[in-house]
């Protein structure tokens, strides 16, 4: 609650300052309204050109462009105040570039394509073209109906980690679930295991303090907040990271709807029985999760890594439980 109030105050103050700055400009040039119009016309043209140049999705940017062109003063003020997604444009561009760079690790095995029934081949091609991840067949998949079923398996695999642990979640909240996980992560980090955490800054805004990554670094755990909330970079906090996954040694990946918070394992759930499921994957598809995580990590940190060092060799594993 304290974190939520503190972060809310920061954002509110930032918004007030931004609006105040715009008002002061207009009051200062009150007797020269023509000058203001010219300034905003020039600024709006520059902003539109910038949006067109950096756009990764014209359908998303077009409403802003139209608003600015039709109402230069109003549209420009609104974008500068509320357009937080454009202040994050550098991050989005880094993600886009990193994902493109990592396509070299995600080649579809043509032998698998030939095995798939023609009725499903179009679905595979669609997912491969748009999600840009290959299908694989050498996998074991286990489904968990509830978070409290998923959780013990996650803890067990974390305790077995020898090389790396990558965790990415929308919500990370203090409580029993996080405490038990952190105990394992601290121990593993002390033994030289590469432990990395990504959490969404908006999703965890009421739970974690702004210096949480620094706190974890004292234990040797690397941590970054995704798309950090800043009152001076707009309040339109779009582009959130809703992914929930853990990858361990390239051998096993966990995903699903379970965040790191007690209600997801039905401890102290104020809303009754909490229903979210999860899956555990062992096999070739784990590397897809590794690439997903590293794409976001290296878009933020910009580490030049060969991701093949995180790929586990499953050539001795023979399993055919469908396609992942």
Give each language-model segment a name:
Residues 1-324:
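N-terminal localization/anchoring segments of enzymes in phospholipid and broader phosphate metabolism
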């Amino acid at each position: 609650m304290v974190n939520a109030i503190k972060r809310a105050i920061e954002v509110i103050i930032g918004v007030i300052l931004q609006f105040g700055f715009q008002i002061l400009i207009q009051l200062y040039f009150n007797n020269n309204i023509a000058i203001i119009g010219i300034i905003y016309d020039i600024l709006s043209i520059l902003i539109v050109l910038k949006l067109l140049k950096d756009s990764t999705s014209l359908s998303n940017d077009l409403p802003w462009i139209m608003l600015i062109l039709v109402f230069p003063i109003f549209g420009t003020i609104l974008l500068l105040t509320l357009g937080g997604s454009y202040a994050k444009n550098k991050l989005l561009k880094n993600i886009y570039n990193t994902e493109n760079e990592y396509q070299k690790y995600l080649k579809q095995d043509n032998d698998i394509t030939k095995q798939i029934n023609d009725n499903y081949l179009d679905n595979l091609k669609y997912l491969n073209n748009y999600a840009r991840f290959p299908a694989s067949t050498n996998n074991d998949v286990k489904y968990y109906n509830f978070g409290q079923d998923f959780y013990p398996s996650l803890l067990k695999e974390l305790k077995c980690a020898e090389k790396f642990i990558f965790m990415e979640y929308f919500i990370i909240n203090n409580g029993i679930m996080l405490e038990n996980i952190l105990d394992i992560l601290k121990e593993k980090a002390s033994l030289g295991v590469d432990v990395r955490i990504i959490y969404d800054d908006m999703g965890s805004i009421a739970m974690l303090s702004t210096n949480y990554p620094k706190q974890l670094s004292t234990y040797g755990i690397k941590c970054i907040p995704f798309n950090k909330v800043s009152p001076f970079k707009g309040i339109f906090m779009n582009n959130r990271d809703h992914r929930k996954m853990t990858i361990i040694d390239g051998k096993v990946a966990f995903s699903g709807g379970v965040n790191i918070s007690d209600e997801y394992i039905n401890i102290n759930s104020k809303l009754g029985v909490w229903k979210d499921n999860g899956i555990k994957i062992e096999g070739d598809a784990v590397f897809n999760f590794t690439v997903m995580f590293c794409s976001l990590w290296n878009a933020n940190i910009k580490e030049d890594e060969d991701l093949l060092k995180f790929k586990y060799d499953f050539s001795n594993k023979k399993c055919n439980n469908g396609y992942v």
